[in-house]
Amino acid sequence: MATLDMRDGHAETGATGAVQTQAFDVVVIGGGPAGMAAALTAHKAGARVAIVEREQHLGGILRQCIHPGFGLSHFKQELTGPEYAQRFIDQVRATDIALFLNSMVLGIDSGEGVGASMSVSGTTAGHTVTLMCRDSMLQLTGRTVVLAMGCRERTRSEIKIPGSRPAGVFTAGLAQRYINIENLKPGSRAVILGSGDIGLIMARRCTLEGISVEGVYELMPYANGLRRNVKNCLDDFGIPLHLSTTVTRVIGRDRVEAVEVSQVDEHLAPIPGTERTVPCDTLLLSVGLIPENELSVAAGVELDPRTRGAVVDQSLQTVVPGIFACGNVLHVHDLADNVTTESERAGAAAAAYALGDGAETNAVADTSCELTVSPAGIAGYALPGRITAVALTKLNFRVRRPVDTARVRILANGEEMFAGKVRAFKPSVMESFPLPAKVIQRALDLGASEIVLSVDPVEEA
């Protein structure tokens, strides 16, 4: 394994001022669970692989997720986040995958000028990834690029909470890093806005660290985290969950002194007269995650406005040939195990494309098959957004609101092609639904250009 830790300046450039160029079959951007899974799968397929990671260590967000609950699907045992990550780190370090740590990607160039170079396998290198390191710049050329940059948290400015701007307002993930990695206590008395999984987990973590959690406040009339986290993190510790309630003002000059909370109506607007003040010195925000796709957009990748991730086909290839996406940069997942499974698919497809075997893994589109996939009913999104091959496909989706009885239906030209069983759905759970090859072929035979995944509530008898 070649490790280039740019913090220590281990990478050497040639002549002074020259930009060193290295060639790979697959360049993976991101060294978290998605990036490592994609890289390992591509390496096993025979591709020469590089991982670029802006942090000093591999592992991504899992390094600070010291709670259990990882690995139940992939390893059939319960692990903490660092334990789960370390299993992949050990596998990566046992290979010759090149690691570029402490390196920031500046851009991905897919221009024609790159096409003259050759990848390690002998095929034309279609992309150049430019890195900024401490002492130099590097360029990595590759036939394929896998985007695995993960996601970031929404901040106070993005949800526009009124009030003063004192110290003591953190995103939940930042507070998690302070406590679990930096050994810093963010405050003594906390209010948590948002019932996403990280907010629920931090309610428990703060309690264990001696921080009094006054309550978790959720804008929606239901919890946005997994049910097991509501039970394990709130119910078991006696932490109250206030639904249909939000923070409407931050109070304090130098440090947070209190927050004002208000109940909201069915339109999510604060109800006048329901305001009350909750004394605290810390406000943690768990108000959503955003796929980190600035590099993707600059490279010409089309984004889905519903997921804010890339539009991909069954092989997880974006609209830019040779660029694939996986993990939370594609759509936000509930479980790291699911990230791993999806990213292994992306790594296999990227390697097949780079090594010239794309047709065997649907990495090369069938020109006779081009269908878009759209959500309907209470489905918030459907992924992949494109069908480019007649093959069994797994569609991922989330619903916009919880429902006790609903059915998934696949439609084409207004005709029902396939339907699932009636069951319950929750927004906190990413769902999957099979799309058989025969259904895709039938849609094509009907002359359809779109397949619709509709989740429709069913009235109980």
Residue positions per predicted region:
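Surface beta-strand/loop "capping" patches
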Residues: 359-403
